[in-house]
């Protein structure tokens, strides 16, 4: 179980010697600091790697407090698995030095009364340093060596200058006068800096909501001349998968920075990119009408404009922390268009695209609110019939164009001009990049038609994020299975996508190294069986359906019969056997559970190629595992049937 870490606060005399402690506002005004202290652990390490299951619901957890020693109980319904991949001495990290000084000699300094996200990340720094080294613990005495988190009274001119060079929600890590500083341009950046230090030096891997791993390292030296600064490429990063969407801690660890679905107060997470009201398909709601797909308003009707403008102001007034207001078309099916009245059509014909009338409308909204709501952007979609950029109209400076890739192929990279679907999208993004300073992307990273089918897009994820970076994209929204936990690779895919958004400059080799590391620690010793499954089905899928979209059913990617007209039972059974072997090789019950949950996709594959009786048998297995692991949806907005009889099972086909 997690060890209870009690914070002790220095005596009044010591506080006076360090400087009177005051609060720090959200503008990063320097404040005095509180010392958290260190000491050598006396815990007896175990001799073998452990998988520790902890429940914050029933455990005491440490909280950095303002001048008092306090133990707080945090409500949570999720158990976290912390796997310590230990050295021979039973400790994940035998030796950690900072600037040549052993970690045991360091104390932790954090801004008193500062943002909750900074103080929470300091809590986690203490927790994982103690777990990793068995040497970092709280002590009452001060030290000549400090780890300084955020804006404090320890700031030197060198630190202030380094902080000023940080952009967006990035951070800098550097040594100065015997202190290691981790600080950002904002509170959220400081939090991310702490998590990056834990990942880059301590070997912590925040793999999933329920799984954090400390990997084996014998010795780590943080050099005395360390000076690392990370400035994010994308100002907005949103990995829109279930755990990222609904668990703020998971999103924070992943460095996702949108908060429209968060129940956590914005200040507690250090701010972020937030929407006023709904974040997409808002045009009917802004007219006080119920949402209706495939129906669009007349964008040259003055009454429509004035009503939308009035409600835009109301939404912004009700959400003063929001930085974006979405004024976006209703969802629509392929081939559907917007208003076809003479006035709208005249603009569209002149601009060569229905985006003509939409962008005229959006620019007018943006101009009318810019003085009253400085720093707020109007977001609209380039989606379906509005995807093509207009000939002469350019987005206003406070307009965001969110270009959507829903029609694209996801077994070819978006930059691959040999793919006809992606060639057209490439032309569109190039046109938008030439006229738009605030270009966001809405990308699709899952199969919306069948949640249980392997989606063979892992080989293009790195390429596609590179593609966005190279076309001046400033924000990325990656839609995934957001309505339910998944029986495919939700945890792996969202982990890799978040890594790419935070660091799109990583090499392809680094991307695949992250993939292999995740598979190893999340699924256990049989991870190579799972990698073989992924590789085999990716190649098989490309062969039988070279252009995979997000609405393709499983049997289109993995046909029930082979080229000779025979059932593909051998392929599907071979793939299931790989999962069964991985299950047997998994070392812990948690890893076995991960394997079993993700094996749903293999049972569904067997269903695709089976006889009538076999199909029902495998679907019953799929259904049973979905019930066991709380999987509530089998496709986009389609919940699982409420029983496992044959009639209801047919809906899963």
Region annotations inferred by a language model:
Residues 20-23:
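C-terminal motif of bacterial Sec signal peptides marking the signal peptidase cleavage site
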Residues 25-27, 66-75, 79-172, 208, ...:
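Acidic, contiguous N-terminal accessory segments
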Residues 25-49, 53:
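Short, low-complexity, disordered segments immediately C-terminal to signal peptides
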Residues 113, 121-124, 128, 164-360, ...:
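Feature activates predominantly on carbohydrate-active enzymes
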Residues 299, 303-306, 314, 420-528:
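Structured mid-domain segments that build the active-site/substrate or prosthetic-cofactor binding neighborhood
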Residues 362-388, 439-446, 476-481:
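Aromatic-lined carbohydrate-recognition surfaces of secreted/lumenal glycan-active proteins
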Residues 379-407, 452-460, 485-494:
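Substrate-binding cleft/loops of secretory-pathway carbohydrate-active enzymes
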Residues 500-653:
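Catalytic domains of carbohydrate-active enzymes that cleave complex glycans
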């Amino acid at each position: 179980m997690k060890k209870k870490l009690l914070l002790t606060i220095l005596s009044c005399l010591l506080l006076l010697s360090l400087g009177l402690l005051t609060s720090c506002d959200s503008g990063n005004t320097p404040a005095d600091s509180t010392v958290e202290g260190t000491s050598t652990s006396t815990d007896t390490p175990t001799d073998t790697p452990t998988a520790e299951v902890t429940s914050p619901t029933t455990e005491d957890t440490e909280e950095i407090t303002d001048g008092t020693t306090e133990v707080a109980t945090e409500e949570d319904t999720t158990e976290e698995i912390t796997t310590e991949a230990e050295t021979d001495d039973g400790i994940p990290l035998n030796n950690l030095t900072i600037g040549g000084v052993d970690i045991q000699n360091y104390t932790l300094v954090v801004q008193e009364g500062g943002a909750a996200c900074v103080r929470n990340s300091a809590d986690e720094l203490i927790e994982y340093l103690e777990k990793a080294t068995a040497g970092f613990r709280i002590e009452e005495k001060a030290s000549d060596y400090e780890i300084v988190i955020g804006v404090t009274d320890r700031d030197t001119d060198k630190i202030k200058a380094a902080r000023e060079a940080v952009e967006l929600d990035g951070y800098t890590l550097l040594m100065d006068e015997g202190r290691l500083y981790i600080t950002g341009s904002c509170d959220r950046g400081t939090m991310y800096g702490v998590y990056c230090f834990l990942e880059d030096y301590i070997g912590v891997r925040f793999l999933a909501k329920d799984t954090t791993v400390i990997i084996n390292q014998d010795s780590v030296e943080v050099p005395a001349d360390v000076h690392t600064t990370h400035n994010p490429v994308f100002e907005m990063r949103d990995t829109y998968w279930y755990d990222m969407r609904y668990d703020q801690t998971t999103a924070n660890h992943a460095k996702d920075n949108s908060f429209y679905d968060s129940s956590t107060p914005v200040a507690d997470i250090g701010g972020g990119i937030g929407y006023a009201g709904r974040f997409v398909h808002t045009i009917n709601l802004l007219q006080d009408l119920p949402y209706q797909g495939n129906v669009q308003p007349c964008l040259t009707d003055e009454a429509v404009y004035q009503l939308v403008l009035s409600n835009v102001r109301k939404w912004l007034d009700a959400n003063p922390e929001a930085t974006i207001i979405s004024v976006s078309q209703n969802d629509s099916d392929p081939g559907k268009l917007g208003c076809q009245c003479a006035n709208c059509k005249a603009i569209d014909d002149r601009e060569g695209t229905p985006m003509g009338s939409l962008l005229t409308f959006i620019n007018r909204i943006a101009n009318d609110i810019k003085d009253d709501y400085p720093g707020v952007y109007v977001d609209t979609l380039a989606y379906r019939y509005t995807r093509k950029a207009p000939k002469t109209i350019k987005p206003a400076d406070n307009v965001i164009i969110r270009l959507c890739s829903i029609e694209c192929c996801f077994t070819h990279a978006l930059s691959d001009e040999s793919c006809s679907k992606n060639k057209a999208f490439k032309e569109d993004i190039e046109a938008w990049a030439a006229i738009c300073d605030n270009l966001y992307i809405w990308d699709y990273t899952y199969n919306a038609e069948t949640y249980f089918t392997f989606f063979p897009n892992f080989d293009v994820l790195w390429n596609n994020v590179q593609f966005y970076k190279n076309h001046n994209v400033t924000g990325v929204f990656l839609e995934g299975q957001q309505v339910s936990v998944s029986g495919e690779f939700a945890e792996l895919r969202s982990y890799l996508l978040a890594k790419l958004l935070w660091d799109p400059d990583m090499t392809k080799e680094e991307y695949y190294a992250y993939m292999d590391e995740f598979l190893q620690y999340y699924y256990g010793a049989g991870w190579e069986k799972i990698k073989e499954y992924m590789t085999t089905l990716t190649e098989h899928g490309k062969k039988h359906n070279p252009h995979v979209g997000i609405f393709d059913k499983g049997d289109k990617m993995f046909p029930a019969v082979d080229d000779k007209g025979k059932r593909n039972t051998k392929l599907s059974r071979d793939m299931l056997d790989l999962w069964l072997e991985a299950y047997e090789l998994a070392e812990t019950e948690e890893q076995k559970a991960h394997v079993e949950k993700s094996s749903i996709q293999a049972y569904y594959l067997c269903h695709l190629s089976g006889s009538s009786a076999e199909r029902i048998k495998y679907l019953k297995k799929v259904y049973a595992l979905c019930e066991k692991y709380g999987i509530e949806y089998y496709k986009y907005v389609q919940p699982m049937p409420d029983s496992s009889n044959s009639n209801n099972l047919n809906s899963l086909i």
